[in-house]
Amino acid sequence: MYIKMATVANGQPDNSSLSSNPTGHMNGLTHSPGGAATIPMKDHDAIKLFIGQIPRNLDEKDLKPLFEEFGKIYELTVLKDRFTGMHKGCAFLTYCERESALKAQSALHEQKTLPGMNRPIQVKPADSESRGGCAFVKYSSHAEAQAAINALHGSQTMPGASSSLVVKFADTDKERTMRRMQQMAGQMGMFNPMAIQFGAYGAYAQALMQQQAAIMASVAQGGYLNPMAAFAAAQMQQMAALNMNGLAAAPMTPTSGGSTPPGITAPAVPSIPSPIGVNGFTGIPAQANGQPAAEAVFANGIHPYPAQSPTAADPLQQAYAGVQQYAAAYPAAYGQISQAFPQPPPMIPQQQREGPEGCNLFIYHLPQEFGDAELMQMFLPFGFVSFDNPASAQAAIQAMNGFQIGMKRLKVQLKRPKDANRPY
C-alpha cells in the first residue's frame, strides 16, 4: 500500500501536494477557506462497492455527480489496465457511511442504464477475495529466502484458507511477461503456427533417431544389414529436410525401388557359402569374370537396373536420395549403393521479409536478453511484427504500446516510410 503524505511548510500544509492526485483516485478531501484540508472519515463497517457497466469515456469526475446524491464519497477509482492504461469499464466506490452504499445499491443496481451501454449498471459489494490471497516478501539474500521456503512451504494452513501455505520463488519479469502473452493468445483463441509448421518434422526426427539407433546396434552386433531398413531411414531424413524447407515430400514405398525393373526377369539367388566376410557378413560367390553377383550385392531380391546412357535419369537414384550418410555402416559390398546417391537437399535459408507499407512495426526498449523467439511469442496474438494489412498493425499497436517488460514499457509504432529523412 502506498500512502501519499501532505508536506508541511512553516506549520501549514502544502496544498499543492493534495490538489494533484497522480493515481487518478478521487476521494472526499475538502478544503477550508483557510487552506487546511479536512480528511474524511469513513465508518469502520463501510462497504466497498464494485461498479460495472460504465461507459469507457467516463472518468472519476464524470461519475462523481451520479453517486454523490446518495452520500459523501470517500473514494472513487476507475479501473484501468496497468499496462496499456485503457479504461476497463468498471470502478470501485467507497462511501463514508455504510447507509449511503446500501442506498446507492438499492437505487442503481440493474435499475439504470448509462448512455452508450446495452446493460444496466451493476452496483454490488466488491469481492473480498479479489486480493488473490497472495503476497510478496523480499529477503536480503538468496540463502534467507531459501530457508524461509524450506521452513514454511506446506507447513501450515492459515486461518480461513482452504489449503496449506505455498511459499516459492516468484517468477522473473521475463517469465511473467511470457505467461501473460500466452494467456492473451489463449483468450483470443489463437495457436502457435510454429507448432503446426514443424510438428511433422519433430515426428520425423524422432523416428529417424530410433531407426538409426536400430541400424547401428545391428551392425555392432555383427547382424545382417537390411538395405531396405537403410532406405527407410534415408526416406525419413529426406522427408524431414523437405518439410523444413516447406516442400511436400511423397513417402517412398518398399515397392518403389525394391521391385524388379520392367523387362527384367528376376534370376534365382545363388546359395550363400559359409561366412568368410568381415563382421560376420557372408562372402559373395564370384562369377567367371571375377565380379560378384548382382543379386548378392542387392540383397532381399532387389535387382539392379540395366545400363543406361549417361543422360538418362535414374529413378532409383532419385527415389533413394540421401542415403550417402549411411555408407559408414555398410560393409564393403554395400559401399557402391551409397556412392551412387547424392546428398539430401540443403536447408533453404529464410530471408528477412517486410510487410507492405504501413504494416511494419519498430519496437523500442526491448531487453537485451530477448531474441527472435521471445519477440515472436510476444506478438503471436497479432500475427507478427510485419502484418499483411494495416488493421492488424493498428490492433497490435493499441494492445502492445505501453506494455511493461521489466522496468521499461514497450513503445510500438508504425515504421516510418523509407523515404522519411528522420531517424527512429
From Swiss-Prot:
The keyword RNA-binding applies. Its main location: nucleus. Residues 47-128, 342-417 form the RRM domain. Residues 9-24 have a biased composition (Polar residues). Residues 8-27 are annotated as: Disordered. Keywords: Cytoplasm, mRNA processing, Nucleus, Repeat, RNA-binding. Coiled coil: none annotated. GO terms for biological process: mRNA processing; positive regulation of mRNA splicing, via spliceosome. GO terms for cellular component: cytoplasm; nucleus. Disulfide bonds: none annotated. InterPro entries: CELF3/4/5/6_RRM1 (IPR034648), Nucleotide-bd_a/b_plait_sf (IPR012677), RBD_domain_sf (IPR035979), RRM_dom (IPR000504). The keyword Nucleus applies. It is found in: Nucleus; Cytoplasm. Belongs to the CELF/BRUNOL family. RNA-binding protein that may be implicated in the regulation of pre-mRNA alternative splicing. This is CUGBP Elav-like family member 4. The gene is celf4.
